[in-house]
Amino acid sequence: KKKRITAFLVDKGTPGFTVRDGYRNVSHRGYNNMILEFDDCRLPKSQVLGEVHKGFEVAGTWLGATRLQVASTCLGRAERALGHALAYAAERKQFGSQIGKFQGISFKLADMAMELKAAELLTREAAWKYDKGTVTEADMSMAKLKATEVLAMIADEAIQIHGGMGLMDELPLERIWRDARVERIWEGTSEIQRHIISRELLRPLGA
């Protein structure tokens, strides 16, 4: 009886099913977060997706692909944040020198570029395997985990390099920073991704 979940397709207007306004989200403000309420909602067999008690399999058919999608969008935003940080470090001067020449800033930029490249390679490899049909859950989890955490780091460091100006809404950095937070939660939290990765590592050893 473990993990017995069934997936259903619920039509709007089904008796007992209500959609109402949700909460305002800090991240991704361009869409609505709606609340789905079920009150004695009964559904016919025809609205079962897949097989009864096989809801996890249904979710698995699209969850891996969406994790790669999340990883890819995170790479784009991380690249944009790094671009702003580089431009500002080359333009802004303190004590008669560009701040990008100061070790405290230059090391940040190097780490940001290195982590972005690592996340990109993980994501590209997972996408390549996905197209070939050889991708594993761990491949997709590694890509999602690395890309989301790299985006968070780069967004934070880009703001740090800009100082107080980085938090102003005249620049896109504060939005990238806000949006980065939810990426480590949806499509499986960072903790879930680590669980999936370690589970695949231990499985051949019988653990």
Residue ranges and their predicted role:
Residues 1-87, 97, 190-207:
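FAD-binding core of flavoproteins
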Residues 28, 134, 141-207:
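Alpha-helix capping/hinge segments and adjacent helical runs
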Residues 86-100, 113-146, 159-164:
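C-terminal helix-coil-helix/basic helical segment that borders enzyme active sites and/or dimer interfaces
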Residues 46-63, 88-102, 126, 160-176:
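Conserved catalytic-core motifs characterized by acidic clusters
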